[in-house]
Amino acid sequence: MASMSPRICGTWNQNGWLCSKMGLHITSQTQKCIPCVDKEDLKSETLGMVVKAGNATAMRAIVTTETEEDITLVTECVGKIYNLEETDKNVWTLYGEPETTCIVNQPATVELTCATLVNRIPQLIDAPAGYVTTDQFPYNEYMVHPMNCYVKSK
């Protein structure tokens, strides 16, 4: 059997991006991956198979980022096969004064991901040559006019 190297979840990059946007300086970052199982067989249309009870049906990736400013970011991303009682949701909780939680039930994940990428095209055209990380881009904006109206380097 081939050995498997550890995988870094997208949440790892997300924490770095958030810290950069907030002017925080990262001192350490760790990721913990936790496999999840279901008590019943789950049919996956995407995989074209039934995953037997007790086999992995999900992975929780928990990334903890410590900063010089004594602010800790803990983010979690779960990729899974849903059982009949489950739906996708995004939950963000900011701990502090006041504690705030935002929950988006059944987000349009595919559409939101595609819209975010497409709306970045004018910024990509305007970006300097070379490798530029997205934390250096301006904030994304909703385009109400044709895309070419947002290209500034014409």
Region spans (language model):
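Active-site-lining helix/loop region of Rossmann-like oxidoreductase modules
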Residues: 1-80, 85-88, 107, 114
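C-terminal helical cap and adjacent loop that interface with cofactors, partners, or active-site loops
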Residues: 81-154
